[in-house]
Curated annotation (Swiss-Prot):
Organism of provenance: Bacteroides fragilis (strain YCH46)
Cellular location(s): Cell inner membrane
Protein name: ATP synthase subunit beta
Record-level Gene Ontology MF annotations: ATP binding; ATP hydrolysis activity; proton-transporting ATP synthase activity, rotational mechanism
Binding site for ATP: 157-164
PROSITE patterns the record matches: ATPASE_ALPHA_BETA
Superkingdom of this protein's organism: Bacteria
Length: 505
């Protein structure tokens, strides 16, 4: 059978209807999720993805790029399969878009063995059930809501509380500490942040463009002729972007494109030994939002708060693929924008059901000047269990939560009557809780250029020791500011002694 050619019959925003001529007997319409190609007048190609079969000869598709300039009657060519992503060592250190084209201005990528972005989750017998902790070097996370290898972690927070900075620090720490490989999917976020992330990664050595390029970048140039491709393949991250300015089709699919890249690296572990892959999605809310934008145009009835009726299905299909197999693990960290700080909104609420750990960022904590602004009482982890993390770790974490909870309860009394009305025992609790609260902060490597303070990665043993000393009252004599933005307890003691000396002068 010769290849059938379609023609555009209707364009409504990002949704394109394609009509295929032919009799019923010889006409085989492209399958759902197949990619079709439209050649624009300027020679560039536009990929559209089949979403529905409507009528007898028409398919309804969603465009992966702007539909500006399309006209009725333009030819449409089926590609014979779904959108695919390139795989292998060649994609290390590279930037790609939703359809797997390179967007970093460097050489084109080879499509041999490319993976389809619509894949089935691993079979049950291929899964692994071993529980292991992934230590990040960030005190508040490692102590109170430890991440599990192969788990799903949600970063919840409103606008501007530090989700992206925390993700950048995690990428930096995992690359340095675990020699792990990271895949970053930028889903509907700011293009500027993507640019900053790439520069940050080149500076920290997570992505390598070679010394010659790095020197020219530091002088303010961006000269791709100086890129050393042998160095690029030693990079420890790949970036996939579908940013805010992209149409909703691209934003809804780019999370799947990034996940496909992460799966390809995990599956390479079958040859090279088990691999730990970190998969970052910034922001999973935009995945839902893009789905709701397209949903109405596809003629679906909206459900609660205007979201698509298939919200739970789309989310489940993606989340089920993020898992550990015998060839390696994919640990995913998903930033979740919370609309109007409302955790009961269907988008964050649907995401919650899939998560193993939640890190909730709070505006109240940013107002205290404590960064990362993680809310220790709202954040949770399924693996904070003495059988997994050890008895001492578990006990210290519970004591930290108890003292912070008691402090929260006493705040109402303090705000009305003042500290003087508290009993001596309660006053001691408040003073220690304030030290604990400040010690949960720490300087970040990726924020060093803004703060001027070198970043700290703290081992879990040092974290447990530090909080135990505060809870046991061994450092009650030190002023509260000593505990703010330090790594280990030794740094806090040194800082506290300097503050005491200055106060006594």
């Amino acid at each position: 059978m010769s290849q059938i050619i379609g023609h555009i019959s209707q364009v409504i925003g990002p949704v394109v209807d394609v009509y295929f001529e032919g009799t019923e007997s010889d006409l085989i319409l492209p399958s759902i999720h197949d990619a079709l190609e439209i050649k624009r007048h300027n020679g560039k190609k536009l990929i559209v993805e089949v979403q529905q079969h409507i009528g007898e000869n028409t398919v309804r598709t969603v465009a992966m790029d702007s539909t500006d300039g399309l006209q009725r009657g333009m030819k449409v060519f089926p590609t014979g399969g779904p959108i695919t992503m390139p795989v292998g060592e060649q994609i290390k250190g590279r930037l790609m878009n939703v359809v797997g084209d390179s967007i970093d201005g460097m050489k084109e990528l080879n499509r041999d063995g490319a993976y389809s972005i619509h894949r089935d989750p691993p079979k049950f017998e291929d899964l692994t059930t071993v529980q292991e902790v992934l230590f990040t070097g960030i005190k508040v996370i490692d102590l109170l809501e430890p991440y599990s290898k192969g788990g799903k972690i949600g970063l919840f927070g409103g606008a501007g509380v530090g989700k992206t900075v925390l993700i950048m620090e995690l990428i930096n720490n995992i690359a340095k500490k675990h020699n792990g490989f990271s895949v970053f999917a930028g889903v509907g976020e700011r293009t500027r942040e993507g640019n900053d992330l790439l520069r940050e990664m080149i500076e920290s050595g997570v992505i390598r463009y070679g010394e010659a390029f790095k020197e020219s970048m530091e002088k303010g140039h961006w000269d791709l002729s100086k890129v050393d491709y042998n160095e690029v393949e030693k990079s420890q991250a790949t970036l996939v972007f579908g940013q805010m300015n992209e149409p909703p089709g691209a934003r809804a699919s780019v999370a799947l494109s990034g996940l496909t890249v992460a799966e390809s690296f995990r599956d390479m572990g079958a040859k090279s030994g088990a691999r730990d892959i970190l998969f970052f999605i910034d922001n999973i809310f935009r995945f839902t939002q893009a789905g709701s934008e397209v949903s109405a145009l596809l003629g679906r009835m909206p459900s609660a708060v205007g979201y698509q009726p298939t919200l739970a299905t789309e989310m489940g299909a993606m989340q089920e693929r993020i898992t550990s197999t015998k060839t390696g693990s994919i640990t995913s960290v998903q930033a979740v924008y919370v609309p109007a700080d409302d955790l009961t909104d269907p988008a964050p609420a649907t995401t919650f059901t899939h998560l193993d750990a939640t890190t909730v960022l709070s505006r109240k904590i940013t107002e205290l000047g404590i960064y990362p602004a993680v809310d220790p009482l709202e954040s949770t982890s399924r693996i904070l269990d003495p059988h997994i993390v050890g008895q001492e770790h578990y006990d210290v974490a519970q004591r930290v939560k108890q003292i912070l909870q008691r402090n929260k309860e006493l705040q109402d009394i303090i705000s009305i009557l003042g500290m003087e009305e508290l009993s001596d025992a309660d006053r001691l609790v408040v003073n220690r809780a304030r030290r604990v609260q400040r010690f949960l902060s720490q300087p970040f490597t990726v924020a060093e250029q803004f703060t001027g303070v070198p970043g700290a990665m703290v081992a879990i043993e040092d974290t447990i020791k530090g909080f135990k000393m505060i809870l046991d009252g061994e450092v009650d004599y030190l002023p509260e500011p000593a505990f703010l933005n330090v790594g280990t307890i030794e740094e806090a003691i040194e800082k506290g002694k300097k503050l005491l000396e200055q106060a006594n002068k």
